[in-house]
Amino acid sequence: MTRSRRRFLKLTIGAELRRQLVTSVRVRRGPYNDNVDFPPVVRKAHSVRPIGVGIGDRGYDSERNHELLREELHAMSMIPPRMKDVALCRTEGLYRKEMKRRFSERVYHQRAKDETIFSVVKRTMGDEMRSVRTKGLNNEIRVRMIAYNAMRVASSFVGGFLQSQFS
Protein backbone atom coordinates (compact mmCIF):
# COMPACT_ATOMS: atom_id res chain seq x y z
CA MET A 1 0.00 0.00 0.00
CA THR A 2 1.46 3.34 -1.02
CA ARG A 3 0.90 6.46 0.96
CA SER A 4 0.02 9.64 -0.83
CA ARG A 5 2.23 12.59 -0.03
CA ARG A 6 0.45 15.20 2.02
CA ARG A 7 0.22 18.46 0.12
CA PHE A 8 0.46 21.72 1.99
CA LEU A 9 -0.16 25.34 1.11
CA LYS A 10 2.80 27.26 -0.22
CA LEU A 11 2.62 31.03 -0.01
CA THR A 12 4.91 33.34 -1.96
CA ILE A 13 4.65 37.05 -1.22
CA GLY A 14 6.11 40.24 -2.57
CA ALA A 15 6.46 42.84 0.15
CA GLU A 16 7.39 46.48 0.51
CA LEU A 17 9.89 46.13 3.33
CA ARG A 18 10.10 49.71 4.59
CA ARG A 19 6.49 49.63 5.85
CA GLN A 20 6.19 45.83 5.79
CA LEU A 21 3.17 45.74 3.50
CA VAL A 22 2.29 42.81 1.24
CA THR A 23 2.17 43.92 -2.40
CA SER A 24 1.58 40.59 -4.17
CA VAL A 25 0.55 37.06 -3.22
CA ARG A 26 0.77 33.67 -4.91
CA VAL A 27 -0.78 30.60 -3.27
CA ARG A 28 -0.32 27.03 -4.45
CA ARG A 29 -0.27 23.51 -3.12
CA GLY A 30 3.22 22.27 -2.25
CA PRO A 31 5.76 20.84 -2.46
CA TYR A 32 6.63 22.80 -5.58
CA ASN A 33 9.55 24.59 -7.19
CA ASP A 34 9.89 28.20 -5.95
CA ASN A 35 11.13 29.54 -9.30
CA VAL A 36 7.72 29.09 -10.94
CA ASP A 37 6.12 31.65 -8.62
CA PHE A 38 8.91 34.24 -8.72
CA PRO A 39 8.16 36.07 -12.04
CA PRO A 40 4.41 36.67 -11.49
CA VAL A 41 4.90 37.76 -7.87
CA VAL A 42 7.75 40.13 -8.73
CA ARG A 43 5.94 41.62 -11.74
CA LYS A 44 2.79 42.22 -9.70
CA ALA A 45 4.79 43.75 -6.83
CA HIS A 46 6.58 46.00 -9.33
CA SER A 47 3.26 47.16 -10.80
CA VAL A 48 2.11 48.18 -7.30
CA ARG A 49 5.36 49.90 -6.36
CA PRO A 50 8.64 49.97 -8.34
CA ILE A 51 11.25 47.59 -6.95
CA GLY A 52 14.64 49.00 -5.97
CA VAL A 53 16.16 45.78 -4.64
CA GLY A 54 14.69 42.32 -5.17
CA ILE A 55 15.61 40.04 -2.27
CA GLY A 56 14.95 36.30 -2.32
CA ASP A 57 16.24 33.19 -0.61
CA ARG A 58 18.45 30.50 -2.18
CA GLY A 59 15.45 28.77 -3.76
CA TYR A 60 15.07 31.68 -6.19
CA ASP A 61 18.69 31.63 -7.40
CA SER A 62 18.56 31.27 -11.17
CA GLU A 63 19.94 33.36 -13.99
CA ARG A 64 16.40 33.95 -15.29
CA ASN A 65 15.31 35.51 -12.00
CA HIS A 66 18.37 37.77 -11.90
CA GLU A 67 17.72 38.80 -15.53
CA LEU A 68 14.07 39.54 -14.75
CA LEU A 69 14.97 41.83 -11.87
CA ARG A 70 17.92 43.56 -13.52
CA GLU A 71 17.04 43.81 -17.20
CA GLU A 72 13.25 43.93 -17.24
CA LEU A 73 12.50 45.71 -13.95
CA HIS A 74 15.79 47.66 -13.65
CA ALA A 75 16.23 46.63 -10.02
CA MET A 76 19.18 45.25 -8.10
CA SER A 77 18.91 41.54 -7.28
CA MET A 78 20.08 40.16 -3.94
CA ILE A 79 19.65 36.39 -4.06
CA PRO A 80 22.35 34.25 -2.42
CA PRO A 81 23.96 31.56 -4.58
CA ARG A 82 22.52 28.09 -4.07
CA MET A 83 25.91 26.42 -3.92
CA LYS A 84 28.21 28.93 -2.29
CA ASP A 85 31.14 26.48 -2.09
CA VAL A 86 31.35 26.01 -5.88
CA ALA A 87 34.20 27.97 -7.47
CA LEU A 88 33.32 31.20 -9.27
CA CYS A 89 34.64 29.85 -12.59
CA ARG A 90 32.18 26.92 -12.37
CA THR A 91 29.16 29.13 -11.62
CA GLU A 92 27.00 29.63 -14.69
CA GLY A 93 25.47 32.95 -15.65
CA LEU A 94 26.71 36.53 -15.69
CA TYR A 95 24.46 37.79 -12.89
CA ARG A 96 24.96 34.73 -10.70
CA LYS A 97 28.73 35.23 -10.89
CA GLU A 98 28.32 38.89 -10.04
CA MET A 99 26.12 37.93 -7.08
CA LYS A 100 28.85 35.61 -5.80
CA ARG A 101 31.37 38.44 -6.00
CA ARG A 102 29.24 41.25 -4.57
CA PHE A 103 26.75 39.60 -2.24
CA SER A 104 25.86 41.90 0.68
CA GLU A 105 24.75 40.27 3.94
CA ARG A 106 23.59 43.67 5.21
CA VAL A 107 21.13 44.14 2.35
CA TYR A 108 20.10 40.47 2.30
CA HIS A 109 19.30 40.61 6.02
CA GLN A 110 16.25 42.75 5.13
CA ARG A 111 14.64 39.50 3.95
CA ALA A 112 13.97 38.71 7.61
CA LYS A 113 11.14 41.25 7.39
CA ASP A 114 9.30 38.85 5.06
CA GLU A 115 9.51 36.20 7.75
CA THR A 116 8.25 38.79 10.24
CA ILE A 117 5.17 39.29 8.07
CA PHE A 118 4.46 35.54 8.12
CA SER A 119 5.00 35.44 11.87
CA VAL A 120 2.67 38.38 12.56
CA VAL A 121 -0.07 36.89 10.37
CA LYS A 122 0.17 33.54 12.17
CA ARG A 123 0.27 35.15 15.63
CA THR A 124 -2.63 37.54 15.08
CA MET A 125 -4.87 35.36 12.90
CA GLY A 126 -3.79 31.85 13.86
CA ASP A 127 -2.10 29.23 11.74
CA GLU A 128 -5.15 27.01 11.25
CA MET A 129 -7.14 27.29 8.07
CA ARG A 130 -10.90 26.87 8.34
CA SER A 131 -11.61 26.19 4.68
CA VAL A 132 -11.56 22.69 3.25
CA ARG A 133 -11.47 23.19 -0.52
CA THR A 134 -8.50 24.64 -2.35
CA LYS A 135 -10.35 27.69 -3.66
CA GLY A 136 -11.58 28.52 -0.16
CA LEU A 137 -8.07 28.09 1.27
CA ASN A 138 -6.61 30.40 -1.37
CA ASN A 139 -9.27 33.02 -0.69
CA GLU A 140 -8.77 32.71 3.07
CA ILE A 141 -5.04 33.37 2.71
CA ARG A 142 -5.65 36.35 0.42
CA VAL A 143 -8.14 37.81 2.89
CA ARG A 144 -5.60 37.35 5.70
CA MET A 145 -3.01 39.27 3.70
CA ILE A 146 -5.51 42.08 3.03
CA ALA A 147 -6.43 42.15 6.73
CA TYR A 148 -2.73 42.24 7.65
CA ASN A 149 -2.15 45.22 5.33
CA ALA A 150 -5.20 47.02 6.74
CA MET A 151 -3.92 46.39 10.26
CA ARG A 152 -0.45 47.75 9.37
CA VAL A 153 -1.84 50.87 7.69
CA ALA A 154 -4.29 51.54 10.52
CA SER A 155 -1.65 51.09 13.23
CA SER A 156 0.80 53.39 11.44
CA PHE A 157 -1.94 55.99 10.95
CA VAL A 158 -3.11 55.83 14.57
CA GLY A 159 0.49 55.72 15.83
CA GLY A 160 1.38 58.82 13.80
CA PHE A 161 -1.78 60.57 14.96
CA LEU A 162 -1.09 59.82 18.63
CA GLN A 163 2.53 60.93 18.34
CA SER A 164 1.50 64.27 16.81
CA GLN A 165 -1.11 64.81 19.56
CA PHE A 166 1.27 64.21 22.46
CA SER A 167 4.47 65.74 21.10
Where do the model's predicted regions map?
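Polybasic low-complexity intrinsically disordered regions
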Residues: 1-73, 145
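C-terminal domain-tail junction helix/linker
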Residues: 130-167
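Residue-level detector of flexible, active-site-proximal loop/helix-junction positions
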Residues: 29, 84-85, 136
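A short, polar/proline- and glycine-enriched secondary-structure boundary/capping micro-motif
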Residues: 33-37, 89-90, 166
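Electropositive phosphate-/nucleotide-binding environments in soluble metabolic enzymes
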Residues: 32, 111, 140, 144
